[in-house]
Amino acid sequence: MLISIHVGHEYSFDASLLNRERIFQLENKRDDGIWEANFARPQLERFIAASPYIEAAAITNNLVYSSVRFGISASEGPDARSYMEQVERITPGYTKVFGFELVAGDTDCLKRPEGTLIPESMARKLFGEENPIGKPVYLSEFAGAEGSIIYGLSFEPAYIVGGVFRDFPENTRVKNALYIPIMEKEMMENWHTGLYYCYLLMSTPESASVTTETYMADSRAFLKSFTIEDMRLRPLSDLYFGQPVRADAAPIGNKLRTNMLFFIAILIIGIALVNYINLSIALAPIRTKSITIQKVPRYGSIWSWSPWESRLSPSSSPCFSCYF
Protein backbone atom coordinates (compact mmCIF):
# COMPACT_ATOMS: atom_id res chain seq x y z
CA MET A 1 0.00 0.00 0.00
CA LEU A 2 2.76 2.44 0.96
CA ILE A 3 4.70 1.59 -2.19
CA SER A 4 1.67 2.19 -4.40
CA ILE A 5 1.01 5.55 -2.71
CA HIS A 6 4.62 6.65 -3.22
CA VAL A 7 4.74 5.48 -6.84
CA GLY A 8 1.44 7.20 -7.60
CA HIS A 9 2.77 10.40 -6.01
CA GLU A 10 5.90 10.32 -8.15
CA TYR A 11 4.33 9.40 -11.50
CA SER A 12 1.62 12.05 -11.15
CA PHE A 13 3.95 14.89 -10.14
CA ASP A 14 2.73 18.16 -11.73
CA ALA A 15 -0.05 16.24 -13.51
CA SER A 16 -2.74 18.34 -11.80
CA LEU A 17 -1.47 21.62 -13.28
CA LEU A 18 -3.62 23.18 -15.98
CA ASN A 19 -2.07 23.53 -19.45
CA ARG A 20 0.81 21.35 -18.29
CA GLU A 21 1.77 20.42 -21.87
CA ARG A 22 2.25 24.12 -22.76
CA ILE A 23 4.41 25.13 -19.78
CA PHE A 24 8.18 25.30 -20.29
CA GLN A 25 11.17 26.29 -18.17
CA LEU A 26 13.70 28.64 -19.75
CA GLU A 27 17.32 27.48 -19.42
CA ASN A 28 20.69 28.63 -20.72
CA LYS A 29 24.01 26.94 -21.42
CA ARG A 30 27.13 28.77 -20.29
CA ASP A 31 30.53 28.70 -21.94
CA ASP A 32 31.53 25.81 -19.65
CA GLY A 33 28.95 23.62 -21.42
CA ILE A 34 26.64 23.26 -18.41
CA TRP A 35 22.95 24.07 -18.55
CA GLU A 36 21.49 26.22 -15.78
CA ALA A 37 18.11 27.73 -14.94
CA ASN A 38 18.93 31.10 -13.37
CA PHE A 39 18.98 34.41 -15.25
CA ALA A 40 19.49 38.09 -14.66
CA ARG A 41 16.14 39.88 -14.65
CA PRO A 42 16.73 41.98 -17.81
CA GLN A 43 17.78 38.88 -19.75
CA LEU A 44 14.43 37.27 -18.99
CA GLU A 45 12.40 40.34 -19.88
CA ARG A 46 14.28 40.69 -23.16
CA PHE A 47 13.52 37.09 -24.12
CA ILE A 48 9.85 37.38 -23.14
CA ALA A 49 9.39 40.55 -25.19
CA ALA A 50 10.94 38.96 -28.29
CA SER A 51 8.38 36.19 -28.87
CA PRO A 52 4.73 36.48 -29.97
CA TYR A 53 4.10 32.85 -28.94
CA ILE A 54 4.40 33.51 -25.19
CA GLU A 55 0.96 33.80 -23.59
CA ALA A 56 2.19 34.37 -20.03
CA ALA A 57 5.49 34.48 -18.16
CA ALA A 58 6.15 33.43 -14.57
CA ILE A 59 9.26 34.86 -12.92
CA THR A 60 10.44 33.76 -9.49
CA ASN A 61 13.71 34.29 -7.63
CA ASN A 62 16.21 32.34 -5.59
CA LEU A 63 13.95 31.96 -2.55
CA VAL A 64 11.57 29.76 -4.50
CA TYR A 65 11.74 26.05 -3.57
CA SER A 66 14.25 26.85 -0.83
CA SER A 67 13.93 26.00 2.84
CA VAL A 68 13.55 29.66 3.82
CA ARG A 69 10.51 30.09 6.05
CA PHE A 70 9.25 33.02 8.06
CA GLY A 71 7.03 33.38 11.08
CA ILE A 72 3.63 34.57 9.81
CA SER A 73 0.97 36.01 12.11
CA ALA A 74 -2.34 37.82 11.74
CA SER A 75 -1.60 40.34 14.51
CA GLU A 76 1.26 42.24 16.09
CA GLY A 77 2.62 42.17 19.59
CA PRO A 78 4.40 39.70 21.85
CA ASP A 79 1.30 37.55 22.24
CA ALA A 80 0.71 37.14 18.50
CA ARG A 81 0.63 33.52 17.40
CA SER A 82 3.05 32.87 14.53
CA TYR A 83 3.20 29.99 12.06
CA MET A 84 6.32 29.04 10.14
CA GLU A 85 5.36 29.30 6.48
CA GLN A 86 7.17 29.31 3.17
CA VAL A 87 7.34 32.68 1.43
CA GLU A 88 7.72 32.95 -2.35
CA ARG A 89 8.31 35.99 -4.54
CA ILE A 90 6.64 36.01 -7.96
CA THR A 91 5.45 38.24 -10.77
CA PRO A 92 1.68 38.44 -11.45
CA GLY A 93 2.13 36.23 -14.53
CA TYR A 94 3.03 33.31 -12.28
CA THR A 95 -0.64 32.86 -11.40
CA LYS A 96 -1.59 32.73 -15.10
CA VAL A 97 1.08 30.22 -16.07
CA PHE A 98 0.22 27.78 -13.29
CA GLY A 99 -3.53 28.36 -13.26
CA PHE A 100 -4.19 29.61 -9.74
CA GLU A 101 -7.87 29.14 -8.84
CA LEU A 102 -8.93 32.10 -6.73
CA VAL A 103 -11.69 31.65 -4.16
CA ALA A 104 -11.56 35.27 -2.97
CA GLY A 105 -9.98 38.54 -4.14
CA ASP A 106 -7.83 38.83 -7.26
CA THR A 107 -4.21 38.76 -8.43
CA ASP A 108 -3.95 42.54 -8.93
CA CYS A 109 -2.63 42.69 -5.38
CA LEU A 110 0.70 41.46 -6.75
CA LYS A 111 1.08 44.78 -8.56
CA ARG A 112 1.46 46.54 -5.19
CA PRO A 113 4.56 46.16 -2.96
CA GLU A 114 2.48 45.24 0.09
CA GLY A 115 0.07 42.87 -1.66
CA THR A 116 0.02 39.13 -1.05
CA LEU A 117 -1.75 35.93 -2.08
CA ILE A 118 -2.31 33.14 0.43
CA PRO A 119 -3.76 29.61 0.12
CA GLU A 120 -7.08 28.59 1.67
CA SER A 121 -5.34 26.46 4.30
CA MET A 122 -3.26 29.41 5.49
CA ALA A 123 -6.29 31.72 5.48
CA ARG A 124 -8.16 29.32 7.79
CA LYS A 125 -5.11 28.97 10.00
CA LEU A 126 -4.63 32.72 10.40
CA PHE A 127 -8.18 34.07 10.24
CA GLY A 128 -10.51 31.14 10.89
CA GLU A 129 -13.86 31.66 9.15
CA GLU A 130 -13.36 35.43 8.75
CA ASN A 131 -12.88 37.02 5.35
CA PRO A 132 -9.11 37.59 5.02
CA ILE A 133 -9.26 40.06 2.11
CA GLY A 134 -7.84 43.43 3.12
CA LYS A 135 -6.38 42.15 6.38
CA PRO A 136 -2.67 42.37 7.22
CA VAL A 137 -0.28 39.51 7.80
CA TYR A 138 2.99 40.14 9.58
CA LEU A 139 6.44 38.64 9.17
CA SER A 140 7.41 38.23 12.81
CA GLU A 141 11.14 38.38 12.05
CA PHE A 142 10.69 41.98 10.86
CA ALA A 143 8.46 43.17 13.71
CA GLY A 144 8.95 46.87 14.39
CA ALA A 145 11.06 47.40 11.26
CA GLU A 146 10.10 49.54 8.29
CA GLY A 147 11.45 46.94 5.92
CA SER A 148 14.24 44.41 5.55
CA ILE A 149 16.69 43.24 2.91
CA ILE A 150 17.44 39.53 2.52
CA TYR A 151 19.73 38.27 -0.24
CA GLY A 152 19.52 41.76 -1.72
CA LEU A 153 15.72 41.55 -1.93
CA SER A 154 13.31 43.87 -0.15
CA PHE A 155 10.65 42.65 2.28
CA GLU A 156 7.86 44.60 3.94
CA PRO A 157 7.15 44.07 7.66
CA ALA A 158 3.45 43.55 6.87
CA TYR A 159 1.49 42.53 3.77
CA ILE A 160 -2.17 43.01 2.92
CA VAL A 161 -4.08 39.92 1.77
CA GLY A 162 -5.49 40.65 -1.68
CA GLY A 163 -6.38 37.15 -2.82
CA VAL A 164 -6.95 33.60 -1.59
CA PHE A 165 -6.30 30.65 -3.88
CA ARG A 166 -7.34 27.03 -3.69
CA ASP A 167 -4.56 24.80 -2.35
CA PHE A 168 -2.47 22.88 -4.85
CA PRO A 169 -1.77 19.15 -4.37
CA GLU A 170 1.47 18.36 -2.59
CA ASN A 171 2.99 16.68 -5.63
CA THR A 172 3.42 19.85 -7.69
CA ARG A 173 6.21 22.39 -7.90
CA VAL A 174 3.72 25.13 -7.00
CA LYS A 175 3.77 25.56 -3.23
CA ASN A 176 0.95 26.51 -0.90
CA ALA A 177 2.97 29.46 0.31
CA LEU A 178 2.52 33.13 1.05
CA TYR A 179 3.19 34.83 -2.30
CA ILE A 180 4.57 38.35 -2.37
CA PRO A 181 5.36 40.42 -5.47
CA ILE A 182 8.44 40.92 -7.58
CA MET A 183 7.94 44.49 -8.70
CA GLU A 184 8.11 45.52 -12.34
CA LYS A 185 11.40 47.46 -12.11
CA GLU A 186 13.19 45.22 -9.63
CA MET A 187 16.87 44.73 -10.61
CA MET A 188 16.17 45.72 -14.20
CA GLU A 189 19.53 47.51 -14.36
CA ASN A 190 21.56 44.47 -13.33
CA TRP A 191 22.47 42.22 -16.29
CA HIS A 192 24.92 39.98 -14.43
CA THR A 193 23.22 38.75 -11.24
CA GLY A 194 21.26 35.59 -11.91
CA LEU A 195 18.65 35.60 -9.17
CA TYR A 196 15.61 34.73 -11.27
CA TYR A 197 13.92 31.70 -12.83
CA CYS A 198 11.30 31.68 -15.55
CA TYR A 199 8.41 29.49 -16.70
CA LEU A 200 6.55 30.30 -19.89
CA LEU A 201 3.06 29.41 -21.07
CA MET A 202 3.37 28.95 -24.82
CA SER A 203 0.55 29.22 -27.36
CA THR A 204 1.31 25.66 -28.54
CA PRO A 205 3.91 23.07 -27.48
CA GLU A 206 5.48 23.27 -30.96
CA SER A 207 6.11 27.01 -30.68
CA ALA A 208 8.75 26.50 -27.96
CA SER A 209 11.51 25.33 -30.29
CA VAL A 210 10.67 28.02 -32.85
CA THR A 211 10.92 30.69 -30.15
CA THR A 212 14.38 29.69 -28.92
CA GLU A 213 15.78 29.12 -32.42
CA THR A 214 14.60 32.53 -33.59
CA TYR A 215 15.91 34.26 -30.48
CA MET A 216 19.33 32.61 -30.70
CA ALA A 217 19.62 33.49 -34.39
CA ASP A 218 18.94 37.14 -33.62
CA SER A 219 20.84 37.46 -30.34
CA ARG A 220 23.77 35.03 -30.41
CA ALA A 221 26.44 37.73 -30.47
CA PHE A 222 24.67 39.69 -27.72
CA LEU A 223 24.37 36.60 -25.50
CA LYS A 224 28.03 35.65 -25.95
CA SER A 225 28.98 38.84 -24.16
CA PHE A 226 27.26 37.33 -21.10
CA THR A 227 28.92 33.91 -21.64
CA ILE A 228 25.61 32.39 -22.77
CA GLU A 229 26.18 29.90 -25.59
CA ASP A 230 22.66 28.57 -26.07
CA MET A 231 19.10 28.71 -24.70
CA ARG A 232 16.28 26.20 -24.60
CA LEU A 233 12.73 25.74 -23.35
CA ARG A 234 12.29 22.45 -21.52
CA PRO A 235 8.76 21.01 -21.11
CA LEU A 236 7.38 20.92 -17.61
CA SER A 237 6.64 17.21 -18.07
CA ASP A 238 10.39 16.53 -18.53
CA LEU A 239 11.59 18.41 -15.46
CA TYR A 240 10.77 16.20 -12.48
CA PHE A 241 12.36 13.01 -13.81
CA GLY A 242 14.76 14.80 -16.15
CA GLN A 243 18.42 15.72 -15.86
CA PRO A 244 18.80 18.42 -13.18
CA VAL A 245 20.45 21.66 -14.23
CA ARG A 246 22.79 23.89 -12.29
CA ALA A 247 21.38 26.45 -9.85
CA ASP A 248 17.87 25.00 -9.97
CA ALA A 249 16.48 24.11 -6.55
CA ALA A 250 13.12 22.87 -7.88
CA PRO A 251 12.08 19.38 -6.71
CA ILE A 252 13.32 16.45 -8.78
CA GLY A 253 12.49 12.75 -8.68
CA ASN A 254 14.43 9.56 -9.26
CA LYS A 255 12.76 7.70 -12.11
CA LEU A 256 14.94 4.59 -11.77
CA ARG A 257 14.05 4.21 -8.11
CA THR A 258 10.37 4.85 -8.83
CA ASN A 259 10.37 2.26 -11.62
CA MET A 260 12.05 -0.25 -9.31
CA LEU A 261 9.43 0.36 -6.63
CA PHE A 262 6.71 -0.07 -9.25
CA PHE A 263 8.10 -3.43 -10.37
CA ILE A 264 8.55 -4.50 -6.73
CA ALA A 265 4.86 -3.71 -6.16
CA ILE A 266 3.93 -5.78 -9.23
CA LEU A 267 6.16 -8.61 -7.98
CA ILE A 268 4.52 -8.53 -4.54
CA ILE A 269 1.07 -8.69 -6.13
CA GLY A 270 2.22 -11.57 -8.35
CA ILE A 271 3.65 -13.51 -5.41
CA ALA A 272 0.48 -12.93 -3.41
CA LEU A 273 -1.62 -14.19 -6.32
CA VAL A 274 0.51 -17.33 -6.73
CA ASN A 275 0.35 -18.00 -2.99
CA TYR A 276 -3.42 -17.63 -3.05
CA ILE A 277 -3.73 -20.09 -5.94
CA ASN A 278 -1.39 -22.59 -4.23
CA LEU A 279 -3.32 -22.28 -0.98
CA SER A 280 -6.61 -22.83 -2.80
CA ILE A 281 -5.23 -25.96 -4.47
CA ALA A 282 -3.83 -27.25 -1.17
CA LEU A 283 -7.17 -26.74 0.58
CA ALA A 284 -9.21 -28.38 -2.19
CA PRO A 285 -9.04 -31.97 -0.72
CA ILE A 286 -9.95 -30.67 2.74
CA ARG A 287 -12.92 -28.79 1.33
CA THR A 288 -14.03 -31.88 -0.63
CA LYS A 289 -13.79 -34.04 2.50
CA SER A 290 -15.75 -31.45 4.47
CA ILE A 291 -18.52 -31.48 1.86
CA THR A 292 -18.59 -35.33 1.93
CA ILE A 293 -18.84 -35.40 5.72
CA GLN A 294 -21.73 -32.95 5.59
CA LYS A 295 -23.61 -35.22 3.11
CA VAL A 296 -22.99 -38.63 4.77
CA PRO A 297 -25.32 -38.10 7.82
CA ARG A 298 -28.27 -37.63 5.48
CA TYR A 299 -27.58 -40.94 3.80
CA GLY A 300 -27.03 -42.54 7.23
CA SER A 301 -30.48 -41.49 8.40
CA ILE A 302 -32.02 -43.22 5.38
CA TRP A 303 -30.10 -46.46 5.78
CA SER A 304 -30.78 -46.60 9.50
CA TRP A 305 -34.30 -47.83 8.74
CA SER A 306 -33.06 -50.95 7.03
CA PRO A 307 -32.74 -53.19 10.18
CA TRP A 308 -36.21 -52.28 11.30
CA GLU A 309 -37.54 -53.02 7.89
CA SER A 310 -35.94 -56.48 8.02
CA ARG A 311 -37.41 -57.14 11.46
CA LEU A 312 -40.86 -55.92 10.56
CA SER A 313 -41.14 -57.81 7.32
CA PRO A 314 -41.59 -61.40 8.75
CA SER A 315 -43.85 -60.34 11.61
CA SER A 316 -45.95 -58.10 9.53
CA SER A 317 -46.53 -60.61 6.73
CA PRO A 318 -49.34 -62.50 8.57
CA CYS A 319 -51.03 -59.24 9.30
CA PHE A 320 -50.85 -58.31 5.70
CA SER A 321 -52.10 -61.78 4.71
CA CYS A 322 -55.02 -61.55 7.12
CA TYR A 323 -55.84 -58.18 5.84
CA PHE A 324 -55.93 -59.42 2.31
Regions found by a protein language model. Name each.
Residues 250-268:
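N-terminal membrane-entry
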Residues 1, 295-300, 318, 322:
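A short glycine-centered flexible hinge/capping loop motif at secondary-structure junctions
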Residues 274-312:
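Intracellular coupling helices
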Residues 3-71, 80-82, 109, 186-188, ...:
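Membrane-proximal extracellular/periplasmic loop immediately following the first transmembrane helix
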Residues 205, 262, 272:
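Metal/cofactor- and membrane transport-associated sequence elements
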Residues 232, 309-324:
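Small-residue-rich transmembrane alpha-helices
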Residues 63-76, 86-104, 116-253:
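Mid-to-C-terminal secondary-structure elements
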